[in-house]
Design a protein with these regions (language model features):
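Acidic, metal-coordinating catalytic segment for phosphate/diphosphate chemistry
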Residues: 2-38, 42-46
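Short helix-to-loop capping/linker segments positioned immediately adjacent to catalytic or ligand/cofactor-binding
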Residues: 14, 90-94, 110-114
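Short, catalytically relevant binding-site loops at active-site mouths
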Residues: 56-58, 105-108
Length: 184
């Protein structure tokens, strides 16, 4: 987590309040609600989901498996642009297509992890990639492409090895018609 990065504080409906704060200082017990995003990247050729293992050096949730990419839009940055920026930085994916918001009002707060707490208004997106990832080792330990059913099995079989938000989003995505339609 970089202290130089800024997060955008939002109200209960996800509207920016006009305030921003340093990313690291904005993930404590006094964390204000701020804007994030979560993205599930599907491989265009076979519709498999890109699942990533967070780098062991990460301050938050190191070594756990999660969805494809997450992050925070910078002040004034469109979420789709932030998704592309983080996918390029974390995964080496220069091109993402058809970015769609499937859970526009998703919000979560994590239990403390070494003093760090997530309190995010975090819309969930789906995007498509045609290229193979080239992960940044500072961000991603490993990755794999899985059918949605195998991802569901992984969440059930290894819940302690999965990110908090991945486990929290799964039941919502299963009931989300736009997402389910993409998985067919």
């Amino acid at each position: 987590m970089s202290e130089a990065e800024q997060v955008v504080f939002v109200d209960e409906h996800g509207n920016p309040t006009g305030e921003v704060g340093p990313k690291l200082a904005s993930h404590t017990a006094a964390t204000k609600l701020h804007l994030g995003f979560s993205c599930y990247i599907l491989r265009r050729s076979d519709n498999k989901l890109l699942v990533t293992e967070r780098a062991l050096s990460k301050k938050v949730w190191p070594g756990v498996w999660t969805n494809s990419v997450c992050g925070h839009p910078a002040p004034g940055e469109k979420v789709a642009d932030a998704i592309r920026r983080r996918a390029a930085y974390e995964l080496g994916l220069a091109q993402l297509d058809d970015i769609q918001c499937v859970l526009p009002t998703y919000r979560y707060t994590t239990p403390p992890y070494h003093g760090i707490i997530e309190n995010e208004f975090c819309p969930v997106y789906v995007a498509y990639a045609s290229d193979e990832p080239r992960p940044n080792p500072e961000e991603v330990e490993a990755y794999k492409w899985l059918p949605w059913s195998a991802y569901a099995d992984m969440l059930r079989a290894e819940p302690d090895n999965m990110s908090y938000w991945a486990k929290d989003q799964y039941p919502l995505l299963r009931l989300c018609e736009p997402f389910v339609a993409l998985m067919d």
